[in-house]
């Protein structure tokens, strides 16, 4: 999942990096094929070039290796709100058929079963980035018919990729997600059964390329570097 998400990034793109799997995927892309990808963190790090996997958006390695550090106000007003982010890399606890995301709460907001980390900058990133990549594990608990809380609105222009451990989803012309590719060894019915709505299939279903040994080695080294 992380490797397939990393493959979505292109060299030279300005990428705003979320926490968790998006963080690993973006840094992996820089190691593999996009060394000139500009990593931006909402804490204010511009052009971060961390030598290890950052533990959070406040990791001191980001400050030490960034080309520039800006205030949170400048980050949200100039960089995100100003449309200067090519790709927003996000995670989600829940996602619906229109790629709306929930990172706030599971269950009623007033008395949730689980209180999630919250919005952070995700709503602004989802609304203002030129494209959005979402990483999530594929299960009926995550891919739901109705979100418990709408944190971030789906990217209605269609420039969205949802990368899961089973395949790749992208919006059709009407904005509804459809399965466009499955990973090696995965059958389309597996993906449909792991989705909380009647998932559409693209007319010509593709298969993602197998993961290479080089990609796996780089990912293992990146994960092993965390916290050093």
Cite the ranges covered by each PLM segment.
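Structural signal for hydrophobic packing residues in well-ordered secondary-structure cores
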Residues: 9, 13, 29, 33, ...
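Charge-rich, low-complexity amphipathic helices
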Residues: 27-31, 47, 51, 101-102, ...
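Conserved phosphate- and dinucleotide-binding cores of soluble alpha/beta proteins
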Residues: 53-214
